Design a protein with these regions (language model features):
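Nucleotide-activated donor-dependent transferases that construct or modify glycoconjugates
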Residues: 1-19, 204-207
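N-terminal strand-loop element at the rim of the active site
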Residues: 10-14, 31-69, 236-239
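Active-site proximal beta-strand in glycosyltransferases
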Residues: 89-91, 104-139, 143-145, 161
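Short His-centered aromatic/hydrophobic patch
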Residues: 92-97
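Conserved donor-binding/catalytic core segment of Leloir-type glycosyltransferases
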Residues: 186-214, 220-224
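Nucleotide-sugar-dependent
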Residues: 210-214, 269-279, 291-302
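Acidic donor-binding loop of glycosyltransferase active sites
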Residues: 260-274, 287
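A charged, aromatic-enriched C-terminal amphipathic alpha-helix characteristic of glycosyltransferases
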Residues: 316-324, 334-365
Length: 366
C-alpha cells in the first residue's frame, strides 16, 4: 500500500508527546499504517521524530509555528510527489484549504481519507475553515471519518449553526450531505490487555489549558481543592496561569504510569462528541472519568463507559456555580475495584489489536 500522509499542522510529530485529541488521531492512524508495512511518504517538518517507525520523510521546514509559507511548500510537495508516484490513499487530519486544493490538483481526491477530531465552533475562524474544507473534501469525492457516534450526531446539528464568520460555508450542500462515513475510526489500539490496579487517592487532569471549549479552569480549580491528592498536567504550548500548580510537558509515558493508579480522571469538555485522548486511555485501564456535560447532550466518554459520572450544567450556568458543582462531585467521588475491571474489559473487547486492525482494514479498503 502506497500512502501520502499529510499531518495535522499544530505540532511536530513525536509519539512520546501526544498533546491533544488531533495528535492522538495522527498517532493512531500512522501507527496502523506503519504496522501493516505501508510505504508512507510523510510530508512533515524538520523537527518530526519517528523513532523506529519507517516512513519516507519529506520535511517542508522547521515547525515552531505553522506558516502560510509552509502551507504553500506543502501544497507544492503534494503535487510533486503525485507526479512521480501512484498512491492508494492520501491521509489528512483537518487539512488547510491549500492542501485540499493541492490534493485535487494532483488528481488524488477520490483516494483522500480525512480524519476529524475538532468540534464545530461557528465563532472561531480557524475552526470554521476546518469544517469548510471538510465540506469541500466531500464535494471533491473524498471521505471523512469521525471518532464516535456522538460526533456524527453533532455533525447533523452543526450544519444549522451559523455566525458572521460562516458566510462562505455552503450550508445547502452540508445539510443535504452528512459529511462522515458510517464507520468510526478507532481511537486507541490495545496491544496487551491492561492490568487493572486498585485505586490510590490520586485524581488527575491531563488537558490543555482552554477556558472556552475545554473549561480547564474548572478542572484545575478541582485539582487545587484536592491538594496533594490532585495532579494537573499541561503542555507548555497551552499552559495555564501561574496560580494553577501543574506539571508542564511531562512525557506521555509518565502520565500514563500515574494514570493507571488514579482514582479518577477529570474531563471538563462539556459539549463535544470527539475523543479526549486521556479519557479513553484512562477508561481502558479501568480508571473512571468525572465528566462535565451540558444537560441532554451525548458525549464520547459515555460511549466507552455508560456509568460515567455526569456533572450536568447548561450554557447559562454561572462559572462560580459550575466550579462548585464540579469540585463537589470530584471531592465526593467513590468507585469500586469491580467497576474498574468491568470498565477496562469493555474497552479491551472493542479496541484490542485484532478488533482495531479489522476497523482500520475496513476504512482502508472502502
Amino acid at each position: 500500500m502506497k500512502v501520502m500522509f499529510i499531518p495535522s499542522r499544530a505540532v511536530p510529530f513525536n509519539p512520546e508527546r501526544v498533546q491533544g485529541g488531533l495528535e492522538a488521531v495522527h498517532l493512531n492512524v500512522l501507527k496502523y499504517l506503519v504496522s501493516i508495512g505501508a510505504d508512507i511518504d510523510y510530508i512533515g517538518f524538520d523537527n518530526d521524530t519517528f523513532g523506529d517507525w519507517k516512513v519516507n520523510h519529506h520535511p517542508v521546514g522547521h515547525l515552531t509555528k505553522f506558516s502560510l509559507g509552509m502551507s504553500y511548500t506543502m501544497a507544492r510537495k503534494i503535487v510533486e510527489l503525485a507526479g512521480i508516484n501512484e498512491y492508494d490513499f492520501v491521509v489528512t487530519m483537518e487539512p488547510t484549504k491549500l492542501t485540499v486544493q493541492a490534493i485535487k490538483d494532483a488528481g488524488l481526491s477520490k483516494v483522500h481519507k480525512n480524519f476529524m477530531a475538532t468540534p464545530f465552533e461557528p465563532v472561531s475562524r480557524g475552526i470554521v475553515q476546518i469544517w469548510d474544507q471538510t465540506i469541500q473534501i466531500h464535494k471533491n469525492g473524498g471521505k471523512s471519518y469521525a471518532p464516535t457516534k456522538a460526533f456524527r450526531e453533532f455533525e447533523r446539528k452543526y450544519c444549522y449553526m451559523t455566525s458572521g464568520l460562516t458566510d462562505k460555508i455552503d450550508y445547502d450542500y452540508w445539510r443535504a450531505n452528512p459529511l462522515f462515513e458510517a464507520e468510526d475510526y478507532p481511537v486507541i489500539c490495545l496491544n496487551d490487555k491492561p492490568e487493572v490496579l486498585p485505586a490510590t487517592d490520586l485524581i488527575i487532569s491531563a488537558q490543555r489549558y482552554d477556558t472556552k471549549m475545554r473549561r480547564t479552569d474548572v478542572a484545575l480549580e478541582a485539582i487545587k481543592a484536592l491538594g496533594e491528592n490532585g495532579a494537573g498536567y499541561c503542555p507548555s504550548k497551552w499552559a495555564p496561569p501561574a496560580k494553577y500548580p501543574v506539571i508542564i510537558d511531562a512525557p506521555h509515558s509518565e502520565i500514563m504510569e500515574r494514570l493507571k493508579m488514579a482514582k479518577a480522571l477529570i474531563n471538563t469538555c462539556p459539549d463535544t462528541g470527539t475523543v479526549e485522548n486521556s479519557s479513553i486511555e484512562a477508561i481502558s485501564k479501568g480508571v473512571p472519568v468525572i465528566q462535565l456535560v451540558f444537560k441532554d447532550y451525548p458525549h464520547a466518554t459515555f460511549e466507552y463507559d455508560p456509568d460515567t459520572v455526569r456533572v450536568e450544567i447548561d450554557s447559562s450556568t454561572p462559572k462560580k456555580e459550575v466550579v462548585a458543582l464540579y469540585t463537589k462531585a470530584v471531592l465526593e467521588f467513590t468507585d469500586t475495584y469491580e467497576a474498574r475491571v468491568k470498565r477496562a474489559e469493555a474497552v479491551w473487547k472493542k479496541y484490542n489489536r485484532d478488533a482495531v486492525v479489522a476497523m482500520w482494514d475496513k476504512i482502508f479498503t472502502a
